[in-house]
Amino acid sequence: MKLIFCLDKNNGMLFAGKRQSRDSILYEELLKRIGECKLWISSYSASLFPQMSNIIIDDDYCSKATENEYCFIENKGYEIDNCKSVIIYKWNRLYPSDTSFNIDLKKNGFKLTLKRDFVGNSHEKITEEIYERV
């Protein structure tokens, strides 16, 4: 499977169980990136995405997604062992956080294959990083 995260400058993900931020352009870019592939999301994330046939809302997505399908991770657990790529969208800001992404991707066999910046709706810079398992 392929995991997708949104992180702040310190790899923060959540604060008090809530997402740190959101940006409509980021979600448009994410949907362009995945194309027609399936995107698994939790019920918590459902309000961020339009209703589309390739978006599946299921709180047990990590156990159901197959090798070439995507999982958007916000407030649920995940397994990096079965993952073949990781996409990280980084906000250009620091937000309060009490849940962070603390996995060393390089130590877990991933290599950065793409890094690009784009302008968001409410963020002057969002960085997309794609890591592939080598």
Regions found by a protein language model. Give the residues of each.
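Enzymes that bind and transform nitrogen-containing heteroaromatic metabolites
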Residues: 1-134
